[in-house]
């Protein structure tokens, strides 16, 4: 199946659409560097690579290794002539002895029978690589002595042990059952002004998710290897992060809606430290259990693994964002060697464009450096090495854009899907979710819908070591989901509500808004009018909004239109959040008898740079009386439109920063700023716009504007 939303550089995918000719004008004349390691797969742009090079489980270098390894594989086959062909590929000693717990043995057999043992040649190549890697020293700290995390585990206070490693099965079963029926909700506010909505599955006993803040790294259950490096780079936890640290390190789901350019780095450090701590503890448990077998005998019960190796998935908007995350990971994880780091920097990192110095800070953070949104990367950690570009099935952490990951999961013909590497993900991080919202949110939903599904193939799994809640199909109830966004939206809330099912509970953290209307970058007061219309449901909202706009807003403007097009309606910018609404309004202006005398231009995220420049010039010079302008175009370009004397917002923007930037267009012409301020801004809204409107008018005002029955027009200056 073809994936919609092809990658782009600082902009959306440009489709070759039929040119729209009906706008009226007045009568005036990467470096495709070779793989540097046997585990690498090609992460270059699709414009430079074929689908085969984007295989999750194979690459050019992996193919070379497979060819050179054939004699060794043949020797292994000769040595295994007498082996049981129906047994698992590795660690067969467990199956030679009858399990003391017959129920669990039956459970293992049931899952094994449901997974086909046949795998294709490419997948077998990946298993060969995995076999070789097992001889390495993994990221275990068995020689480091007993650290704080070990003492916490022994004392039963380590969240990792309580949540993943050794959960109370009876309590877990009750919570899973409760999660499908009843959730309890509580709300409280922090001294910093942050609002927390906590939800947990009600299993017959009250639970408080109002956790005390963590001010010191000593309060975190970190492995000693990480505690030392964390103390160097995070000497203390700031006041804002101290309130959310207990939920991150305590394995609660969290939707954090107050991400900014100022706190982005500290939030990134926190979730990277947490992800590393989880990876190291997971691998330590496996390594230590491996050493227990010779001492305690082969009948010892050890449940310490998932179906596949990857445990952490981090979704990011751009390659440069991936570089920042990897930098954060590498400063906490001191590796003696970093394989393929040079290739990583060459293909993922770029310098900032100096011409963007006048752009807003949030724009520079998102689009600075390499802004390609088509990428994926596997990271593997051993005791002394950090490896880049490892194959997914041999990786501990997967970093990817939603588009890049989806193209790895499905083929264009739609016949083959590969998502088993997501079957054992225990921590999902979505950073800068609001930026992903401006790309193609459908890719995010697609990835979440394929998390923690039962794998279609064994992939060398030792089922005798798989945790019981994996075998029961309950991994999604223990997976931790962390979403960081600059603002909330219905789409983000939907993913959080649908896929965040952590039995420990989940918290939604939002800030209190003063309102974008109070901080406008205009030298004079601007008249701001908000018009409410009644809408019965979200499904009917687009139709209701369109009728209100054409019958009320356009009709009032039409009175000022003349045959020449020069009227008091000139200089009108119509800001439209949705591209679908943009197309509908553009077509209406081009064909309606109501707008016969109107000259207008229309620019969107799919308009060519040349056509955008022409439309802006015509609008500034008065040849266009009206200019249609989409939110996504503003997100990707941040134009400063000149000639604006009136702003009509078909809907308020998702990003509150955009409101101030759009209103600032009124002050770009000093000679006409007084007239523009008087005409001001008119924004349409319904009750379904509550989240967006709160950020624009402020938390204190939103209630009265939604519930006011005495009128539907609200004016601020």
From Swiss-Prot:
GO cellular component: nucleolus; small-subunit processome
Pfam families: Utp25_C (PF06862), UTP25_NTPase-like (PF22916)
Ranges of compositional bias, category Acidic residues: 39-51, 133-150
One of the GO biological process terms: maturation of SSU-rRNA from tricistronic rRNA transcript (SSU-rRNA, 5.8S rRNA, LSU-rRNA)
Basic and acidic residues bias spans: 18-27, 100-120
Entry keywords, A to Z: Nucleus, Ribonucleoprotein, Ribosome biogenesis, rRNA processing
Comp. bias regions, Basic residues: 1-17, 89-99
Localization, UniProt: Nucleus, Nucleolus
SUPFAM superfamilies named in the record: P-loop containing nucleoside triphosphate hydrolases (SSF52540)
The protein's assembly and partners: Component of the ribosomal small subunit (SSU) processome composed of at least 40 protein subunits and snoRNA U3.
Descriptive protein name: U3 small nucleolar RNA-associated protein 25
Organism superkingdom: Eukaryota
Family recorded in the similarity comment: Belongs to the UTP25 family.
Disulfide bond among keywords: no
Organism: Coccidioides posadasii (strain C735) (Valley fever fungus)
Function: DEAD-box RNA helicase-like protein required for pre-18S rRNA processing, specifically at sites A0, A1, and A2.
Annotated stretches, region: Disordered: 1-170
One MF term in the entry's GO annotations: rRNA binding
Major localization class: nucleus
